[in-house]
Structure formats: structure tokens, C-alpha cells
């Protein structure tokens, strides 16, 4: 009897709420030995096997498609799109737990999935959600710093700086300084990662309120609300449909394998044993670039300018095509189309389109986005300068956020960053679990390449 009472008390105090199912950390403890053994066997028995090569064009072309990174959390197929631990987006929408009465997956569920490779139960997601709520809350120096930022400072710069300012909270740094064993690095990295994921919605919401509303956050974290709903309330939004959109948005933007700039940067910085805060802040600086996360705000700006150019009215496909050709012939691109890896329509675009068809089918901006989807692939194919003429995730997200009243385009990448933290930090935890070493590829000069390609060695 006393053992049962002690167990119940432990569950309550640890955020388990009397659930008999394993917590996230307990499940990882169960999974880790088998995974470590699998990797050890692969390195021992097949360590000399070649899994990829690098051409001169790839060396000068951003190392595109060079197989040189190991990422456990997701994989990207050129034809099929992203799979999160083997699950497609439609499968995640079907299998991951949802909010009561909701239809979209909870981001807490994909956090569990990315970390464990398993679909969590509703109880496990609820427990994780409450745990994140308990971890939320910002130190005074961070809130003061955000409120002191100048209005013209880009929200992504504010986000990266705020994450750095939280670094004094790092449990990994303390454990490392206390001499923790290497095989236990992952535990404090997990703690740091959950802490920063829990705090990011408040960081982002404070940036939003301070920059655009000249206000403060009035909502206090409610343990009975999920991570996305609490985020929306802190932003100042109460629409249940917008809650659903935010759950979808924060789920589908979490991860896109390990080679993209934000994921690779987080991994690279983390490989030096930098903690979750330092690593994520660096990743967010990469996400802020126009060729990465900043693209979503650029797409919406382009679409709205096009809408204005067309007279804010519906036009024929022929008229729309002429306007798009005019831009292409002037040397401008069509933002939101094409992808470094994908060769089909991005499934992240498709699920957002399905959401819009259900919730805002008559919205003028959505109708224009749909019409662009109809005409642009054929135009880009004829233009002949892109390998993938189909829309990516950025082509749709802006019009959905705009519809629900979140119209500050410069803030959109911050939402992307809040979501992407889930994926890149899950990967960082696994980097620690598997003991990945510091990343140190070999670089060569143009002179070396010129000499090599003309040598006998290159002809072997």
C-alpha cells in the first residue's frame, strides 16, 4: 500500500498525473540501448562502406544531395515528401492525438514521435503538454531585454537573441561542469530542449506584443490548454479554428531532415558540445535567411502585390499568366515554388490547402493562391529554369495566417522557428545519445580541384 502511495505521489510531483504509461524520458531510456547497439554494429561491420560521393558541381553547389549527415527524426523523398519517423503528413494527421473536438494533430505528439519514433497515446501527450506548461515562464532579464529591443529590430533577430539570453538556465552546462559521464549527456540535453521548447511560445508572443501591439502578454499559461492554444492566447487570439491552424502549422514545420540550414546549423554548433540554447539560437539565425525561413513572408508579400496589380478582383488564368510571365521576363522569380530536394508538390502545401478548402474556401487571397497553383507549374516548366515547378510549404502558410488576422509578415518566420525547434532539438538529443563527434569535414581549394581533375587519380 505504501509503495502504491509513494508511486502515486511521485507521478503527481513529476507531472505524470497518475498515468501508468512511461514518460517521455522513461521511454527513451527503454529505447536507447537497442539503438546504440544497432549503430555500433553498423560502424563495426560496415564502417568502410561508401554511402555517397561528391562531385565538383556538388562541392561548388552547396553540397546538395551529398549523403554525409545522419538524422534520425525525419527523411525527405524527392517524390513523396517528408516522413516524420516513417510517417507521412496524412498519416500524422490521422494517427497523432488531437485536442478534444479537434481534427489536427497536437505538436506535443510530433515531439514525442520525433524523439521516440513512436506514436504516443492521448494520455502521454496530455502529460507531456502539462509538463511543457510547468516548464514555461521567462526570467525577468529576458522579458526586460525583449521589451528594450528597438522597434526596427527584426523579430527573428529578437528571437535568436532571446534564446541566447536564456542560456544561463542550461542544465547541460551545469552537468558538464560537474563532470557528468558522456553517456549521460543526453539527459540534460533533453531537459534543456524541453525547457526551451516550453518557453519559446512566450518568447515569441512577447516579441509580437512588444513589436506590433505595444502591449504586454495578458494570458497566463493554462495547464489545461495545449501548447498551441496557450501560444495563441498569448498572441491575443481566441478562435478555435485558428487554434486548429496553429496546431497544423506547428506540426508540419517541425522538421525537414538534417541538411537544411536551420537543422544543419543546430547540429553543427551542437557537435562542439554547445548546449541546446546556443545551438538553437544559431539555427534560428540560419532560418532567418531569405533563402530559408524568411521565404514565407516574401511569398505573401509577392502574392498581395500581385493581387493589387490585378485590381483586387478575380481574373482569368490567361490574365494571371501574363502577369507572372511579366515578372519572370524581368528577371524576377515566383516565390514559393521549387525546392532543393522535392520534385512534386510539397505535402505540407497540400495539407494547408485542404485546411483552407474546409475553413476559408471563399477567401479572395486563398482563391488567388489556388489559381496561382493552377497556372504556375506549367509556366515554370516552359520557362525551363527550375527542376521542380511545384509549390512548397511557403506558398500557402501566409494566406492562412493573414485570414485569421495575423497580418504582420515579418513575424511569420518566428512562428516557423517556434515549430522548427521541436525537430532540431529532437535531433540534438539523439546526437548526444549516439555520441556523434564534432563535425569537421575536409575543405579544398579551387587550385586543388583544378589539379585533381587533371590528374590520373581522378580518372580511377
UniProtKB/Swiss-Prot annotation:
Keywords: Mitochondrion, Transferase, Transit peptide, Tricarboxylic acid cycle. It catalyses: oxaloacetate + acetyl-CoA + H2O = citrate + CoA + H(+). GO terms for cellular component: mitochondrial matrix; phagocytic vesicle. GO terms for molecular function: citrate (Si)-synthase activity. The active site is at residues 292, 339, 394. Residues 1-25 form a transit peptide. SUPFAM superfamilies: Citrate synthase. Signal peptide: none annotated. PROSITE patterns: CITRATE_SYNTHASE. It is found in: Mitochondrion matrix. PANTHER family: CITRATE SYNTHASE (PTHR11739), CITRATE SYNTHASE, MITOCHONDRIAL (PTHR11739:SF8). Pathway: Carbohydrate metabolism; tricarboxylic acid cycle; isocitrate from oxaloacetate: step 1/2. Belongs to the citrate synthase family. The gene is cs. InterPro entries: Citrate_synth-like_lrg_a-sub, Citrate_synth-like_sm_a-sub, Citrate_synthase, Citrate_synthase_AS, Citrate_synthase_euk, Citrate_synthase_sf. Its main location: mitochondrion. Gene3D superfamilies: Citrate Synthase, domain 1 (1.10.580.10), Cytochrome P450-Terp, domain 2 (1.10.230.10). It comes from Dictyostelium discoideum (Social amoeba). Citrate synthase is found in nearly all cells capable of oxidative metabolism. Its EC number is 2.3.3.16. This is Citrate synthase, mitochondrial. One of its GO terms (biological process) is tricarboxylic acid cycle.
